[in-house]
Amino acid sequence: FESLPVKPDITICVFGYLGENETARAHWQEAEKIIHSNYTGAVSILNVVSNFYAKQQKGTIVGISSVAGERGRQSNYIYGSAKAGFTAYLSGLRNRLFREGVHVVSIQPGFVYTRMTEGLSLPPLLTAKPEQVAEAVYRAIEKKINVVYVKWFWRWIMLIIKCIPEFIFKKMKL
């Protein structure tokens, strides 16, 4: 970032690695790859960007996180925990940078048709196209929205999932 001749006014952090949950449970290297891809890598980049924007007292940071980070589920809890950390990071960054004139956006897309989800059996109604994610990002930047669920119903789906008492939730196969 430091070596760029012209710094961007908007930084969009959009990368992720779902990984193999079963492999990650058995082999730390896979878990580490998931964590570094979804949390450590993003934070290392955005720390540099956020400090620059804070000094400039302007800029926009967009982080693509995941609804998977809103509640740990057996099917992807390592990926979900990394995204939970990233979502919390974005929230803290937003809190820190608001008074500096920097806008921080968290995008919670739900399922998206990408290379990362190729081969997965995704429910079409719940799955966004990359163009829908791009439109949501653009709208959030233009309207200074803080948290965006690409498909509106994900906000309510996750609210319901988060409200399930733990003694019931732990018995569910999600």
Give the location of each predicted region.
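Active-site loop-to-helix junction immediately N-terminal to the catalytic Tyr of the SDR YXXXK motif
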Residues: 72-80, 92, 120
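Active-site-adjacent segment of SDR/Rossmann-fold oxidoreductases
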Residues: 71, 92-103
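C-terminal helical subdomain
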Residues: 106, 122-157
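Residue(s) in the substrate-gating loop at a strand-loop-helix junction
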Residues: 66
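Conserved mid-core segment of classical short-chain dehydrogenase/reductases
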Residues: 10, 16-32, 75
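Short, flexible catalytic-loop segment of classical short-chain dehydrogenase/reductase
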Residues: 109-119
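Active-site helix of classical SDR
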Residues: 46, 82
